[in-house]
């Protein structure tokens, strides 16, 4: 467990309910299942003529993105709006911090807006934990991705995608392929799969993109794609982070695709009903060929749909946990 993850109890209130959502590390299986079940119940909201429920009416959700991500920000906005919350979205990367304002100063200014919840995305690992530790007690903090550390809502939407297509996790073989080293998605997926009882978790990639000691997550390591994909039920492709290419970790994108790109021929080594996932954005012809990304095995667009429901679940559960903690504190202060 890393020092960041050692702060995990911060996420729960005194009744064991979700209060912040910062990492999947150490969260009990029952809580992860509750998130998935709640998300399942929210899926039908998206099919309604009026796509709203009043659970967060009168609450303000502030999306604070120190790092750009149109997809994640948009799905959090939709999730909050469908819960009837008021939504503020700030691209802090182009505002105060670029003028020298510290994270702590930014936090204090955001608190002055009297928001009830912050969704935070930051390039530094641990940023969401820092904010959760220092924000006023009534505010919930959701991690929208922090450095290489965690992307817990992506992890849970991946789990919902798998569960809706494959049912139980107990008999599944899941392969995570690509840039494991820099991927917060890979870390969150590995933690969630292990907690939910998946017995066979594989990571596949070049040696230079696989972290030392990754076996502690309970995974099997493969550096040969064909061997790693043999008879798997689920293939999760990761974005090759091109900004890392300058570090000499890969000779070229073409070489990566030649050895680790998912093609129709290579996918044939997986089970006939295998599903293919990708957190996006996709680099076609680098991680995956278009015939696979758009083919019958792909559930990539389903992931986007399920992501809104998962984020609705997390927002509503965290707000409920904050309310319960506030009531608990008031009763015990009397």
UniProtKB/Swiss-Prot annotation:
Taxonomy, superkingdom: Bacteria
Catalytic reaction annotation: carbamoyl phosphate + L-aspartate = N-carbamoyl-L-aspartate + phosphate + H(+)
Binding site for L-aspartate: 99, 184, 239
Binding residue positions for carbamoyl phosphate: 71-72, 121, 151, 154, 280-281
Record bears the keyword Transferase: yes
PROSITE patterns found in the cross-reference section: CARBAMOYLTRANSFERASE
One Pfam entry name: OTCace
Sequence intervals crossing the membrane: none
Pathway the protein contributes to: Pyrimidine metabolism; UMP biosynthesis via de novo pathway; (S)-dihydroorotate from bicarbonate: step 2/3
Alphabetized InterPro entries for the sequence: Asp/Orn_carbamoyltranf_P-bd, Asp/Orn_carbamoylTrfase, Asp/Orn_carbamoylTrfase_sf, Asp_carbamoyltransf, Asp_carbamoyltransf_Asp/Orn-bd
Keywords: Pyrimidine biosynthesis, Transferase
Listed EC numbers: 2.1.3.2
Disulfide bond sites: none
GO biological process: 'de novo' pyrimidine nucleobase biosynthetic process; 'de novo' UMP biosynthetic process; amino acid metabolic process
Entry's Gene Ontology molecular function annotations: amino acid binding; aspartate carbamoyltransferase activity
Entry's Gene Ontology cellular component terms: cytosol
Biological role: Catalyzes the condensation of carbamoyl phosphate and aspartate to form carbamoyl aspartate and inorganic phosphate, the committed step in the de novo pyrimidine nucleotide biosynthesis pathway.
Subunit architecture: Heterododecamer (2C3:3R2) of six catalytic PyrB chains organized as two trimers (C3), and six regulatory PyrI chains organized as three dimers (R2).
NCBIfam families the UniProt entry points to: asp_carb_tr, PRK00856.1
Similarity annotation: Belongs to the aspartate/ornithine carbamoyltransferase superfamily. ATCase family.
HAMAP family reported for this sequence: Asp_carb_tr
PANTHER family: ASPARTATE CARBAMOYLTRANSFERASE, ORNITHINE CARBAMOYLTRANSFERASE, MITOCHONDRIAL
Official protein name in the record: Aspartate carbamoyltransferase catalytic subunit
Record organism: Pseudomonas putida (strain GB-1)
């Amino acid at each position: 467990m890393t020092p960041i993850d050692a702060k995990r109890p911060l996420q729960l209130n005194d009744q064991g309910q979700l209060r912040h959502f910062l990492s999947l590390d150490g969260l009990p299986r029952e809580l992860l299942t509750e998130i998935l079940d709640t998300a399942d119940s929210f899926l039908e909201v998206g099919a309604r003529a009026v796509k709203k429920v009043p659970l967060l009416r009168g609450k303000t959700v502030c999306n604070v993105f120190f790092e750009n991500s149109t997809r994640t920000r948009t799905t959090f906005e939709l999730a909050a709006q469908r819960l009837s919350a008021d939504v503020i979205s700030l691209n802090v990367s182009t505002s105060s911090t670029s003028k020298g304002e510290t994270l702590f100063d930014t936090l204090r200014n955001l608190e002055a807006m009297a928001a009830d919840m912050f969704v935070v995305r930051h390039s530094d690992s641990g940023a969401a934990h820092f904010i959760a530790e220092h924000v006023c007690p009534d505010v919930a903090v959701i991690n929208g991705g922090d450095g290489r550390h965690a992307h817990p809502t992506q992890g849970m939407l991946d789990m919902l995608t798998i569960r809706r297509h494959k049912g139980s996790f107990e008999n599944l073989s899941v392969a995570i392929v690509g840039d494991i080293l820099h991927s917060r998605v890979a870390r969150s997926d590995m933690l969630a799969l292990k907690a939910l009882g998946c017995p066979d978790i594989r990571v596949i990639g070049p040696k230079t993109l696989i972290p030392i000691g990754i076996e502690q997550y309970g995974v099997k390591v493969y550096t040969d794609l064909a061997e790693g994909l043999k008879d798997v039920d689920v293939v999760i492709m990761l974005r090759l982070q091109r900004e890392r290419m300058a570090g000499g970790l890969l000779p070229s994108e073409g070489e990566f695709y030649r050895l680790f790109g998912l093609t129709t021929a290579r996918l044939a080594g997986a089970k006939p009903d295998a599903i293919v996932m990708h957190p996006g954005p996709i680099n076609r012809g680098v991680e995956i060929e278009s015939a696979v990304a758009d083919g019958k095995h792909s559930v990539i667009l389903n992931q986007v749909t399920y992501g809104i429901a998962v984020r609705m679940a997390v927002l509503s559960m965290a707000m409920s946990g904050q309310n319960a903690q506030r009531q608990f504190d008031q009763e015990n202060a009397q």
